[in-house]
From Swiss-Prot:
Active-site residue numbers: D255
EC code: 2.7.1.56
Species this protein is from: Haemophilus influenzae (strain ATCC 51907 / DSM 11121 / KW20 / Rd)
UniProt name for this protein: 1-phosphofructokinase
Binding sites annotated in the UniProt record for ATP: S222, M223, G224, A225, K226, G227, G254, D255
GO molecular function: 1-phosphofructokinase activity; ATP binding; phosphofructokinase activity
GO cellular component, one term: cytosol
Length: 313
């Protein structure tokens, strides 16, 4: 029986490529790194399964091109609770440049009708009660308003479900109203939420404290190569990985961090151990084009070099 379920409302195929520098208005030749069945919650689930945690996956998939997702679920042993909807699951393009900047071209996908959404709400409220943690990840599909999303999350909250929310923009703002147990915006998403640039660690911490003041028990901020922060009632903890010498793609690094955090919670690790492990999993992710941990021993040398600092508390 799975102990965690991840929800991906707006799944996608990720077409991942690499080139030196995008030239706007010109023809660009891109090295193809792969086409992967993805979506933030699915990425989280893949990493968790590699780490030895049983996971279920839910959300929406387009009927017309679901075969690769279904094959991947079978290969990874993921319990499939996805609702199939009319149309195709979208394709998102992720281009990594030599300097490790990533440009995302995220396309609109399937349209969710009111009837399909209500069926999902009814079904998910029933099955989510069976899991220790429900990770809700990614953007909202067409047809699901921020208000509908917040109402669903609030019903999960009222039912006592422990929700991890990893989203951005309108979905993040709406989701906060339901007071999820943990939220994990990255630096840019935090800037978008607070409404202005955050140019120093102090400013990032202050903004994260504002987020916590919304009634959020745990706030995790991922900051790329600069590490991550964990803000809760115990104080502010900072984790910093060693510099990665071989950055292939940063796609999925944030999802890998969410998986590492959930792994720590499931295994009963301390706050320090959990943040260090999640930071190591995220740092490992940038060394590959796909998401996952094929060999757990590869995490050990990265984990040994993660530096943990208590800033407040």
């Amino acid at each position: 029986m799975a102990s965690v379920v991840t929800i991906t409302l707006n799944a996608a195929y990720d077409l991942v490529g690499r080139l030196n520098r995008i030239q706007l208005g010109e023809v660009n030749t891109v090295e193809t790194l792969g086409l992967f069945p993805a979506g933030k919650g699915i990425n989280v689930a893949k990493v968790l399964k590699d780490l030895g945690v049983n996971v279920a996956v839910g959300g929406f998939l387009g009927k017309d091109n679901s075969a690769d997702f279904e094959q991947m679920f079978n290969q990874h042993g993921l319990e499939d609770k996805f609702h199939r909807v009319d149309g195709k699951t979208r394709i998102n393009v992720k281009i990594t440049e030599t300097e490790a900047d990533v440009t995302d071209l995220n396309f609109l996908g399937y349209q969710i009708s009111p009837q399909v959404w209500q069926q999902f709400v009814t079904d998910s409220l029933a099955y989510c009660l069976n899991y220790d943690i429900v990770a809700v990840c990614g953007s909202l599909p067409r047809g699901v308003s921020p208000e509908l999303f917040a109402d669903w999350l609030n019903q999960l909250h009222q039912a006592g479900v422990k929700v991890v929310l990893d989203s951005s923009n309108a979905a993040l703002t709406a989701g906060l109203k339901a007071k999820p147990w943990l939220v994990k915006p990255n630096h840019r998403e935090l800037e978008a939420w607070v409404g202005h640039p955050l140019n120093s660690l102090e400013e990032i911490i202050a903004a994260a404290q504002q987020l916590k003041a919304e009634g959020i028990e745990n706030v995790i901020i991922s900051m790329g190569a600069k590490g991550s922060l964990w803000i809760n009632n115990e104080g502010v903890l900072k984790a910093e990985p060693a510099q990665c010498e071989n950055v292939v793609s940063t796609v999925g690094a944030g999802d890998s961090m969410v998986a590492g955090l959930i792994y720590g919670f499931e295994k009963g690790l301390s706050k320090t151990e959990t943040l260090a492990f999640a930071t190591a999993v995220s740092a490992f992710a940038v060394s590959q084009s796909n998401v996952g941990v094929s060999d757990l021993s590869l995490l050990d040398p990265i984990l040994e070099k993660v530096q943990i600092t208590m800033i407040e508390g």
